Regions:
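A solvent-exposed, acidic/Ser-Thr-rich amphipathic alpha-helical stretch
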Residues: 20-21, 27-76
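A beta-strand edge to alpha-helix "cap/lid" segment located at domain peripheries
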Residues: 2, 55-145
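Residues at secondary-structure transition points
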Residues: 1, 5, 41-45, 95-96
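Short acidic-aromatic low-complexity motifs
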Residues: 1-25, 29
Length: 145
């Protein structure tokens, strides 16, 4: 399977909320960097936790891959848009049943044996908060937890 096909499969699993299938695609020591959250660590822990929360909060999540290319070192770089309607608290933002869309950039490092060894994701966290109806980040009543 090519790095491109692997990335397409990865984002299909993200859209379907199939975290266990994603974990089956990564190496045992795969890392994740969710840059907007300043969360860096093992994919099996930090990545899985984020993806499970995303799937729970947005059961109707859609992932549209807008651009996808593979570099010479077999890194798949994808520009995606995610959208859905919030159905549960997400990243400490109380559920207001807001529909949102968010552009993201993801980098998946693919090994020669077609496994993902590193995931890096970027997005504008303030844009995410605005889309979910957070007007002021200093008003605790808007956020849960």
């Amino acid at each position: 399977m090519s790095a491109r096909e692997l990335a397409e499969k990865f984002f299909g699993h993200v859209e379907a909320g199939e975290v266990d299938e994603i974990l089956g695609m990564v190496t045992p020591d795969a890392t994740v960097s969710l840059v907007a959250l300043n969360r860096h660590g093992p994919m099996a822990a930090d990545g899985a936790s984020y993806l499970r929360e995303l799937a729970r909060a947005f059961p109707d999540l859609m992932v549209r891959v807008r651009r996808l290319f593979v570099t010479a070192d077999n890194t798949a770089i994808a520009e995606i848009t995610i959208d859905g309607t919030q159905a549960d608290d997400f990243l400490a933002v109380a559920n207001q049943e807001k529909n949102f869309d968010l552009d993201q950039a993801w980098m998946l490092t693919v090994t020669p044996d077609d496994r993902i060894s590193a995931v890096i994701a970027y997005w504008d966290q303030n844009q995410l908060y605005r889309r979910l109806g957070v007007k002021r980040l200093d008003q605790i009543t808007i956020t849960a937890g």
